[in-house]
Amino acid sequence: MITRADALKLDAADILKHKRAEFSIPDGMIYLDGNSLGVLPKAAMARVKHAVDVEWGVDLITSWNKHGWFQKPLVIGNKIARLIGAPKDSVIVADSISVNMFKVLSAALAKNPSRKVIVSDSGNFPSDLYVAQGLNGFINNGHSLRVVEPEAVMDAITDDVAVVMLTETDYRSARRHDMKAVTDKAHATGALVIWDLAHSAGAVPGQLEEVNADFAVGCTYKYLNGGPGSPAFAYVHPRLQNEVMPALVGWWGHAAPFEFSQNYEPAAGIMRMQCGTQPVLSMQALDAAMDVWADVDMVDVYAKAQKMCALFVQLAEARCAKHNVQLFGPRDFSKRGSHVSLRHEQSYAVMQALISKRVIGDFRAPDMMRFGFAPLYNSYADVWDAVEVLRQVLDEKLWDVPQFRERKAVT
């Protein structure tokens, strides 16, 4: 069995170890929840302070030009594009994932007007399904949502399907879809594909251009470390950008927003996927957070993440075997994202006990503890130490107290 000394040797050889110093990690905390909210980059603190003190505090309205506020959605989008395998000027930062999903799904359905079926799976994040349900009701034109098990997606893509809407990395199991196989099958039947990259961006090597994906959305507050509620992104393949129109439009997506025309004329390219004025302070924090990735290769990031995931599972199953802790998700780590879910009948209480011991993960219903591994700031020693605390919590039944059973508003 691997020892803590072995974990420290892995850390010493880690080619990403220098990145940890760029983050503000609370002393004594093992933070394994970057799949839910990333750690604060030190550069983001300085950038936001400058944005408040100087750009807003002194330069005020001139900052739209002087400090490039107006251009930020595309500037940051191009930084994200490199990580998700997208070409230049195909990604825009705006709004939330749910709003962006509404925009790209409405655009995709309008592009395929004779077809009425949206295919998704039971592993998709529920908000995407809610958006599809709401949009179908809003359109009120006979559209339906076909939700199948992840393994049945390929068979569900038939010639009546307008859009296939999937999350690449399952938010619970970390199972990854084969993006190329799904996209190829959809295109062969005449359907368009939307990929939700919420648990992929900054976690796994991107491949949007490689697989010829039509649309994608993703968030920036998880592995990209943009901050709580940081704006999301939308991707549209260049061949579609000037052909599609989202149902939700606004002045920032206008071809000439400062001419204030009473009639909407879409901007060229990806710019039309914007709607309203962007949140500047959040944009500045995200811009600084993305600069942390400038010297990082996603292949290296994913390789480290998979090693950490495998080590975590190996240690947890060995040291917590008598407590019936079970892996939820694939054992083939090449087919996973960068988080691990463990099942236990008292998962919520166990997670609260872990948090009280400064090991931070989260809980997902009905019985899953999630642990996310962010290679820019997590270490192999973090993995070893976290499992040791998990063993202690289970062996000593530290979870078995009333306050750890009481569900909080956010789990």
Predicted segment positions?
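Pyridoxal 5′-phosphate
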Residues: 1-411
